[in-house]
């Protein structure tokens, strides 16, 4: 079942307070150090500041890419920057079950990404226990749009260790819609934090994960 925002949702979205942390219990799951390699041509990696001393490895593998994270971060290409009305999508496969349920997914509206104090983007993630999450980052603050929510659309790791999840964010003139395996799980209006979705679109992967990404695409049209 998908969730949509009406007038009440718009007001709630505007009133969201910053989160101190995206997920609890990180002190029991220390970030691993990973030996980084050369990035694929055209790609940029931006680790969360708290994980800047822990590297991550992002490499071309087969027809897609593989991310082995130490630190949590985002990955993007300048060529994928968009002005409006577009769709970003990718297929994700978690290669190993994590000790904790860490998240991976997509982001849009990335601007000032090289400046930790000014960076902004909207992101959409899933994790191995069948839940999804949507949030907006502005500088050091993370504003929760949808907290961790169970959805039958998200394939769980325990149900099939080699399962994949197709994710998409569709940015249209009046809404931003979020899809898991071709099922719309949520939608928000183009207002407040989601009024301007121009900028970079790319991938986000949290810490201590091994994730394969296939069929990454950014295309015009958000319907």
Predicted regions and their residues:
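Carbohydrate-binding surfaces in secreted/extracellular proteins
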Residues: 90, 159-189
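Short carbohydrate-recognition loop motifs
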Residues: 54-74
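Extracellular carbohydrate-recognition regions
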Residues: 23-52
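Flexible glycan-contacting loops in extracellular carbohydrate-active proteins
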Residues: 188-215
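Extracellular beta-strand elements of beta-rich domains used
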Residues: 90, 214-218
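Secretory/extracellular carbohydrate-interaction modules
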Residues: 69-141
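Bacterial N-terminal signal peptides
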Residues: 8-18
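Short, aromatic/His-centered strand-loop micro-motif at the edge of beta-sheets
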Residues: 140-166
